[in-house]
Amino acid sequence: MKQQVEVKELKEGKYVLADDEPCVIKSIQKSKPGKHGSAKARIEAIGIFDGQKRSIISSVSAKTYVPIVERKSAQVLSISSNIAQLMDMETYTTFELTIPEDYKDRVTEGKDITYIEAMGKMKIDLR
């Protein structure tokens, strides 16, 4: 799911689609309009799921896509090596996600955790 917004409405910490990948905006620089052109914006963003740094250069009045990112809660049913079986607390559906290396000690069976869902992808997110 995604929606279209103008580049001038984007802010740091919000989300944007760069190369069809949902990203968190880290910085935005806007240049002033010149004699023969409109103002431009340079957006630096980091992918939510892959961690890659991406940059977008676009006119401030142009439209871009913003992903709809949902934070949901789930309960850990079981853990086998680096894969956790989770149950969504609202819909009670079960699914499996890989546990990131830095969260391995914090994800235990029976515990409630938060996960991110955007553009058909999911990721465990413990903040």
UniProtKB/Swiss-Prot annotation:
GO cellular component terms, A-Z: cytoplasm
Protein name: Translation initiation factor 5A
Record PROSITE patterns: IF5A_HYPUSINE
Record organism: Methanococcoides burtonii (strain DSM 6242 / NBRC 107633 / OCM 468 / ACE-M)
Family recorded in the similarity comment: Belongs to the eIF-5A family.
Residues where Hypusine is found: K35
Keywords tagged on the record: Cytoplasm, Hypusine, Initiation factor, Protein biosynthesis
The UniProt record lists the keyword Cytoplasm: yes
Recorded name of the encoding gene: eif5a
Entries under SUPFAM superfamilies matching the protein: Nucleic acid-binding proteins (SSF50249), Translation proteins SH3-like domain (SSF50104)
